């Protein structure tokens, strides 16, 4: 771009009433600090139309997950989980919102006395020395088919939920089917009575509706690049009714594969599975209060597994290893991999770590310090991001990148803090991607942290240096990428007081085109639209014309969400089948119950076992 695409995105601004952009009063910051708080009680109602007109043919249901920080420095997307379902019809839009009550979240909400209470470690995770780690299960809602839905989380096992009630039903896999992610020496020190083991997995397990197979991973054993000889990645396969199958991934050199950072995304094609190490680092020293930054390395390690090598009589599988020359987090693949060629798309994360929080009293690059109010919100990137396409060639015993097919597009106005994608058939990859929509969260100069800028000062391929970073804020943007041309064909920049993090594609009735439908976006703004409501809003766009602005804006005084993560659209919902899978975890809790204090036993007996036992 370059800049002409950005200007095209603004061309539609004149069609939108200026009230959407108006600020009633002048303040130093246009950032909506209310993104850090939300209600902890259930709510429901019919959304009010604040602006525009809801399309007459919009339909279906959107599920949106969120995180609510519980204290200062708590990374907000990883906060206490909540989920909202939006029901669209010709009569309007209704919503229902509930907390995501995993067993560990229920326990944390009831226990606050030493030694059982949970303590925040490094802003990232809550830990109890007598019980283990909290799993908020709030990364992404997923569809399994047959009215079965699941929530996933990188720091704990996934759970199925009932779409009609929003209540969790069962973990996927018995807790004993998941391996502890702690290093062996730490694992040896954990008490047998632990209720909530530390499990690391991907934020995006893949539920293949064509083959009726589910794939995910379980990894750990190392801490960053320390203790990698004990590291492991287990590829898990599930038929949605039986126990999990698992294979330890081994490289061509005979050494176990490991992940030093995180594994936010999993790639699945017709014949292959791709495990990505993604750009979100959990620094070991952070857990003891040291705020040092381990910068991303401008690389994405990938392990490529052939599905045909997953033998039922073996517990290992060989993978080929490759490093891609960029940092990314959300990755999608064409399901079609004919001639063993794999095409993937993702963000280009320029000099940033999506899991890096702002901490209380952090020094800001442009002067001042982080306020207590915002401590825990993700730090701003220190360079503009982008969008990438990469292609891989898999042979019988190796894999290589088709370097000549690599594409990177960047835009110095639009591509700041590249975040979630949206596409038709969300979390179900099409044979070939034609259109992907992206959220760019934006750039706020008052969120640029000095220690982060220093850590990334020598990061490769920077367009902006620390000395040339913008001195004014750049707002959130909704971006339409044409995958065949690898270009931005349409875009919309939000008013400066808005934060948009979560887009979701909603198909039009009886349509098949990947751009034939609407875009749902969750927006938090400092100055509510037309001065109505609480600033927690839903904006609806025409997928073929983002630049014209929102078709409709909706809100409700009781719709009060915090930092949203991923969303899911489905055309219809129904009750979960009564005879569907359930993991029998009741005995797991009952055998440990006598080893705990009375208050903990009460929570197990009165709140956990009635739901999960």
Description of each model-found segment:
Residues 6-14, 21-613:
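Beta-propeller domains
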């Amino acid at each position: 771009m370059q800049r002409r695409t950005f200007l095209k995105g603004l061309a539609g601004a004149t069609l939108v009433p200026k009230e959407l952009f108006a600020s009633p009063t002048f303040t130093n910051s246009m950032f909506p600090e209310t993104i850090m708080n939300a209600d902890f009680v259930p709510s429901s109602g019919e959304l009010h139309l604040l602006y525009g007109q809801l399309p007459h043919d919009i339909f279906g249901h959107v599920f949106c997950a969120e995180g609510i920080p519980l204290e200062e420095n708590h990374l907000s997307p990883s906060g206490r989980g909540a989920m909202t379902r939006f029901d669209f019809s010709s009569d309007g839009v209704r919503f229902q919102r509930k907390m995501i009550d995993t067993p560990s979240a229920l326990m944390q909400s009831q226990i606050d006395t030493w030694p059982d209470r949970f303590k925040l470690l490094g802003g990232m995770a809550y830990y109890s020395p007598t019980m283990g780690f909290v799993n908020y299960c709030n990364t992404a809602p997923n569809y399994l088919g047959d009215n079965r839905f699941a929530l996933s989380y990188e720091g704990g096992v996934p759970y199925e939920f009932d779409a009609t009630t929003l209540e969790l039903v069962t973990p996927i896999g018995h807790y004993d089917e998941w391996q502890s992610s702690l290093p062996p020496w730490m694992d040896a020190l954990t008490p047998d009575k632990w209720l909530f083991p530390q499990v690391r997995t991907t934020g995006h397990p893949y539920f293949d509706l064509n083959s009726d197979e589910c794939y995910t991973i379980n990894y750990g054993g190392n801490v960053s690049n320390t203790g990698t000889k004990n590291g492991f990645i287990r590829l898990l396969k599930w038929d949605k009714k039986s126990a999990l199958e698992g294979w330890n991934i081994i490289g061509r050199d005979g050494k176990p594969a490991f992940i030093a950072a995180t594994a936010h995304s999993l790639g699945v094609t017709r014949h292959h599975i791709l495990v990505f190490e993604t750009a979100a680092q959990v620094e070991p020293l952070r857990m003891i209060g040291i705020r040092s930054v381990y910068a991303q390395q401008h690389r994405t390690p990938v392990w490529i597994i052939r599905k045909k090598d997953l033998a039922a009589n073996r517990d290992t599988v060989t993978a080929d290893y490759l490093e891609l020359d960029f940092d990314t987090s959300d990755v999608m693949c064409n399901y079609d991999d004919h001639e063993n060629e794999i095409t993937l798309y993702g963000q280009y994360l320029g000099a940033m770590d999506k899991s890096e929080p702002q901490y209380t009293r952090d020094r800001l690059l442009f002067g001042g310090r982080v306020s207590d109010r915002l401590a825990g919100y993700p730090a701003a990137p220190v360079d503009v991001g982008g969008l990438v396409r990469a292609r891989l060639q898999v042979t019988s015993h190796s894999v290589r990148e088709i370097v000549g097919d690599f594409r990177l597009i960047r835009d110095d106005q639009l591509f700041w803090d590249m975040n979630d994608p949206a596409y038709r058939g969300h979390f179900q990859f099409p044979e070939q991607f034609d259109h992907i929509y992206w959220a760019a969260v934006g750039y706020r100069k008052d969120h640029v942290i000095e220690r982060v800028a220093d850590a990334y000062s020598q990061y490769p391929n920077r367009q902006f240096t620390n000395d040339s970073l913008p001195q004014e804020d750049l707002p959130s943007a909704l971006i339409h990428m044409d995958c065949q041309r690898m270009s931005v064909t349409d875009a919309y920049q939000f008013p400066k007081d808005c934060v948009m993090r979560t887009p979701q594609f909603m198909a039009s009735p009886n349509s098949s085109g990947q751009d034939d439908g609407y875009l749902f976006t969750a927006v938090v703004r400092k100055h509510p639209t037309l001065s109505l409501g609480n600033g927690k809003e839903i904006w609806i766009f025409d997928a073929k014309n983002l630049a014209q602005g929102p078709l409709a804006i909706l809100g409700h005084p009781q719709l009060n969400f915090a930092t949203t993560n991923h969303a899911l659209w489905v055309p219809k919902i129904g009750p979960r089948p009564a005879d569907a899978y359930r993991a029998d975890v009741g005995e797991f809790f009952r055998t440990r119950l006598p080893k705990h204090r009375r208050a903990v036993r009460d929570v197990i007996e009165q709140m956990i076992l009635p739901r999960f036992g």
